[in-house]
Design a protein with these regions (language model features):
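Transmembrane alpha-helices and adjacent helix-loop boundaries
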Residues: 2-348
C-alpha cells in the first residue's frame, strides 16, 4: 500500500512539474512573440521612407506620422484614463501647450521643435500637475466636466493672447529640405515619441506605481485604506499623461508650419484619444495602438468615399458603436478576456 502511495505521489509530482514547465514555456513564448512583433513593426516603419527613392510616397508618410501622433497621445491618455480610471476630455490643452511652447521658441529663436520637444513635454507635465491638484479632487462626471471646462478656458485664453498670435495663430518657418524629404525629420521624431510612449506605458503598468493606479481605479477608498497615497498617484498620472501629449504637440506644430487654437485646442482631439483607447481596449498596452490605427484608417476610408465632411465622422462613429456591441471591453480587452487574443498583440 505504501509503495502504491509513493508511486502515485511521485507521478503527481512529475505531472505537476511538467505542467509548471509547460506554463513557463508558454509564458516565455508569449513574451518573445509580444516583444518581436512591435519591434519588427517599428523597424518596418523606420525603413518605410526608403520608398521615396522609387517614387513620391509623401501621403503614406503623412498617414503614418499622423497615426503615430495619435498612438502617442492615446497611449499617454491611457495612463490616466485606462490605468487610474479618470476620463479626461481636456487633454487637447497639453497638445496645444506643447505645440505653442516649442513653436514660439522656433519662431523667435530658430530652435527646432525636434530639440525642444522634451522641454515642451515637461512644461505640459508641470501644468498638468498643477491642474491635477485642483481637478482631481472630484471624479466621475464632475471630473469630466472640469476637464471640458479646462479646455474651454484654454481656448478663450489662446484666442485672445496676442503674444502668441491670438485667434490668427502663428506661422512657423519650414525646414530647408526638399519637398520629397521635408517630412522625414518629423516622421522619425513622431515615430520615436510613439514608441517611447508605448514602452513607458508598459513600464508604468508593471511597476509599483502602476499597480497603485489600477488599485485606485477599482476602489479608491480601499486603495487609500491600504496605504496608497491616492492623491499623489492621481496627480502624478495626470502629469505623466500630459508629458507625452505635450511632446507630440511640439513636433506636430512644426510639421504643420503653423499654430492656431482652432487646430490644437479642439475637443475632437481629446475625444479621439478617448475613443481610440475605448475601441482598442482601455487599460491595455496594445489597445490604444490598435484603436489609433483603426480610427485613422476608418476616417481616411470615409473621407475618400464620402468627402471631407461631418458624414465621415458619423460613419466612423457608427462603426465604433457597432464594434463595441461585439467587443464591449475594446478589441484587445475583449479578446484577452475570452482567451482569443493573438499572441502578437499580447503586450501586457
Amino acid at each position: 500500500m505504501m509503495t502504491v502511495t509513493l508511486q502515485d505521489s511521485s507521478a503527481s509530482a512529475v505531472i505537476e512539474a511538467r505542467r509548471t514547465y509547460n506554463e513557463k514555456l508558454s509564458r516565455k513564448t508569449d513574451q518573445t512573440r509580444a516583444t518581436w512583433f512591435p519591434l519588427a513593426l517599428l523597424a518596418l516603419l523606420a525603413a518605410l521612407p526608403l520608398l521615396q527613392f522609387v517614387g513620391n510616397y509623401n501621403y503614406v508618410l503623412h498617414l503614418v506620422l499622423f497615426t503615430a501622433s495619435y498612438v502617442a497621445m492615446a497611449s499617454s491618455w491611457n495612463i490616466l484614463g485606462g490605468f487610474a480610471g479618470y476620463v479626461s476630455l481636456g487633454h487637447a490643452v497639453f497638445f496645444g501647450v506643447g505645440g505653442y511652447f516649442s513653436g514660439m521658441l522656433l519662431a523667435r529663436y530658430g530652435i527646432s521643435t525636434l530639440i525642444t520637444a522634451p522641454l515642451a513635454g515637461l512644461v505640459a507635465a508641470a501644468i498638468g500637475y498643477g491642474v491635477g491638484l485642483v481637478t482631481l479632487k472630484v471624479r466621475g462626471p464632475s471630473f469630466i466636466i472640469s476637464s471640458i471646462a479646462l479646455l474651454m478656458i484654454a481656448r478663450i485664453l489662446f484666442d485672445n493672447w496676442h503674444f502668441i498670435g491670438g485667434a490668427n495663430g502663428l506661422t512657423l518657418p519650414p525646414n530647408d529640405l526638399t519637398v520629397q524629404w521635408a517630412k522625414l525629420p518629423y516622421y522619425y521624431a513622431m515615430l520615436a515619441i510613439a514608441a517611447f510612449t508605448v514602452w513607458s506605458a508598459y513600464k508604468i503598468k508593471h511597476s509599483k506605481f502602476g499597480l497603485g493606479l489600477r488599485a485606485l481605479s477599482k476602489d479608491e477608498i480601499k486603495a487609500e485604506s491600504a496605504g496608497i497615497d491616492t492623491r499623489f498617484y492621481k496627480v502624478a498620472a495626470f502629469a505623466l499623461s500630459a508629458f507625452f501629449v505635450g511632446m507630440a504637440g511640439a513636433v506636430w506644430g512644426e510639421y504643420l508650419t503653423y499654430l492656431r487654437p482652432n487646430i490644437f485646442l479642439l475637443i475632437l482631439v481629446s475625444a479621439n484619444m478617448v475613443l481610440m483607447c475605448i475601441l482598442g481596449g482601455k487599460g491595455t498596452i496594445a489597445g490604444p495602438v490598435i484603436g489609433a490605427i483603426l480610427i485613422v484608417a476608418l476616417n481616411e476610408l470615409f473621407v475618400a468615399t464620402m468627402g471631407a465632411s461631418e458624414i465621415n465622422i458619423l460613419g466612423t462613429g457608427l462603426v465604433m458603436a457597432i464594434g463595441l456591441m461585439f467587443f464591449p471591453l475594446g478589441l484587445v480587452g475583449t479578446l484577452a478576456r475570452s482567451g482569443k487574443l493573438p499572441r502578437i498583440l499580447n503586450w501586457d
